Amino acid sequence: MELAKERNGPHQKHHGQCQNHCTSPNTVRQNKTNKLLLVKKKGKLVIWRHIVKKMLHIRLVVLWSHYPEQHGHGTNHYEYTNNSIAKLDAQRVSRRRRKKREAERRDYDTYKLLITLCSLLFVGPLFLKV
């Protein structure tokens, strides 16, 4: 990050400080509601569109892997996602089981402790008397 600052000079600063020589008026167009800044630089928009497409594709693939009969193309892709989902489910189940086991063990330990305390309370005086 430091290297980039040295290399780029004023451009690396916060956008508000270098706005006058970073953006020309036609680059940023403000819409009527004054909320949305639309950047007309084509590269950025293309990148955003690409990211959104990727996200949608991932979501669709995940959905398709739950309904395999609707998924016609890209079987390898589908199998991969399905396997990863199955793996995640298995991890979730095993984690749930492990937690349950630990809870049961804790309950059992407290139960044993209670029993020993009660037995000491009841049996202790008898031994002391004898």
From Swiss-Prot:
Disordered: region residues: 1-28
Gene: CWH36
More about this protein: Almost completely overlaps VMA9.
Species whose genome carries this gene: Saccharomyces cerevisiae (strain ATCC 204508 / S288c) (Baker's yeast)
Protein name, UniProt field: Putative uncharacterized protein CWH36
Compositionally biased intervals (Polar residues): 17-28
Domain of life: Eukaryota
